């Protein structure tokens, strides 16, 4: 009897060990804080503890289970953090202004999905994720869509007078991702819903669809993406289309980036049209750091019916932005960084560096940040 009991426990241990070997769960995150100083033309300056100057502060959990035959199940839960105050960030539950939450406890605002993937057939995700066009912003903006010099200072700011709920992430989505073994071709397609009643006046609000297709080989990478969201036209929001194309080339002595964005929002009074072009580079400094450079230009081509607060055509509200920074790696997980950015506004434009206060119309905005990032 004793030998039989020992045999049973040994067999159970082998089974548990096999299951454990097929599954994994990882805790990961980033804590990024620094001193941020911004100046708004005609308004003044401010100094604060800035968050996410190099990478967005976050905490997350991800896991996979090997189901055999090349099939895997997985999940990803990732939420933004405000480590300067110990709080989480806001999210949006239905891709509409009505679904916006307030910042507070930790929520998984960045990504929260379950997935099934196969080595030959690709991956299907269900949940919340970044929209297709934002992936281009992450990979082809020299400042990785973070900090005072990020391209988003011009791309999304001032589009309407209301935030775009699907400008970066989307809720209630289903997406398909191509398998990796396609000779350098990669891509994905996504659809999301606002989950409104079919007989509601705003039944289509919050629905969106998009796709991204790219090719990477060696030092070269290029991708194009488009996302279209539906909203009932008002004075501040309407059907929204974002298309972009970007690329990078690593020449060894420097890595070069280019990104072009076109944003259109159909408001009740007319269409907002913004074209933003950005070029930049990473220049390695020995084996421990890199210099980051960028120049971006915004050309506003909105309908003449859309006017500024001063009664002038909005199409004259162009802007330019320069950014320069340096990242110094203390280890694989810890880095020091410094960044400076300046925006020159035209007309009555009030574009602002990230974390700053809007200037008087037509005046400039600038800022610098010095910080430390630690990953785990």
Roles of regions detected by a PLM:
Residues 204-329, 340:
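Detector for outer-membrane/organellar transmembrane beta-barrel domains
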Residues 23-37, 46-194, 205, 213-218:
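Outer membrane beta-barrel
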Residues 34-38, 80-84, 131-135, 194-196, ...:
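Structural signature of outer-membrane beta-barrel domains
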